[in-house]
Design a protein with these regions (language model features):
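Extracytoplasmic small-molecule ligand-binding "clamshell" domains
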Residues: 1-43
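An extracytoplasmic/periplasmic, membrane-proximal ligand-sensing/linker region
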Residues: 1-2, 174, 178-239
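Immediate post-signal peptide segment of exported/extracytoplasmic ligand-binding proteins
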Residues: 9, 80-88, 231-239
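Short helices/loops that flank or line small-molecule/ion binding pockets
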Residues: 24-38, 51-52, 82, 126-147
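Short beta-strand-centered segments that line the small-molecule binding cleft or hinge
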Residues: 36-38, 46, 53-68
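Hydrophobic/proline-rich hinge and linker segments of small-molecule sensing/allosteric domains
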Residues: 58-80, 177-180
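Pocket-lining segment of extracytoplasmic ligand-binding domains
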Residues: 77, 87-186
């Protein structure tokens, strides 16, 4: 809500929030011009870009340029992925950049094929569900978005005495704000400028940034998402 009001003020036009059901729905809505601006995970952006050919990523949060995923376990004897050989493991949603795609890609680069390394691979459907599965002993290990992990620990939703991080992925680019390629370029520039102008020293701006878990926004470009596209191709997720 505060972000919508801020954009209305900066752009001098009505801004309407449209909820979407899931990742594929966002891809479809941007491709058919039903959405002008959307907050996308890295993999969803790659799908939108390939489907539309012209979607433009405008800005990302500072941390999205160096995003990571955390590997977690409740087993004190596990200190590496090698220790989970023959045990059970959970990813988040199949099409989640940080909960599935990038961790899988980094595992493959380390010579670990999840389906043969683990006795069973499950998909929890969400980052917090992965943490809950691990904490409840439903799986021996799991992987989730680093910022969600930090939030779960800070809010006490996960017991860090029981569940621990035993590995962190290399960094990659993740979330961004993307506009449809058919949007008026002058308006796209104004939207970008509005995000870049958000200043944490301004209390009103800080409230908007906090809701997005952002320190500030920085510019981004399609080239930044090449690594995710490569990972998606390696995982056979792009047809």
């Amino acid at each position: 809500k505060p972000l919508g009001a801020y954009l209305e003020q900066q752009l001098g036009m009505k801004v309407e929030f449209t909820p979407v059901a899931d990742y594929p729905a966002v891809v479809e809505a941007l491709a058919t011009d039903r959405l002008d601006l959307a907050w996308l995970g890295g993999f969803t952006f790659v799908q939108v870009r390939l489907k539309t050919g012209n979607a433009i990523p405008l800005v990302q949060r500072e941390q999205d340029a160096q995003f990571t995923s955390k590997f977690i376990t409740a087993n004190p004897d596990v200190t590496s992925l090698a220790d989970l050989k023959g045990k059970t493991f959970a990813f988040g949603s199949v099409s989640s950049t940080s909960g599935s795609l990038m961790p899988r890609y980094f595992m493959l680069q380390d010579g670990i094929k999840p389906e043969s390394h683990f006795s069973r691979v499950g998909y929890s459907g969400a980052h917090d569900a992965t943490a809950a599965w691990v904490q409840a002993g439903k799986v021996d290990g799991g992987v989730l978005n680093a910022s969600v992990w930090d939030k779960l620990v800070a809010s006490g939703k996960v017991d860090s005495n029981k569940v621990k991080v035993f590995a962190t992925t290399p960094t990659y680019f993740d979330y961004n704000w993307t506009v449809r390629g058919t949007l008026d370029p002058a308006l796209a520039e104004k939207i970008k400028a509005a995000f870049l102008a958000l200043d944490p020293a301004n209390p009103e701006h800080k409230a908007i940034l906090d809701l997005q878990a952002a320190s500030r926004f920085i510019e981004t470009s399609p080239e930044n998402y090449k690594g995710i596209e490569d990972a998606a191709r390696a995982a056979d997720l792009l047809k």
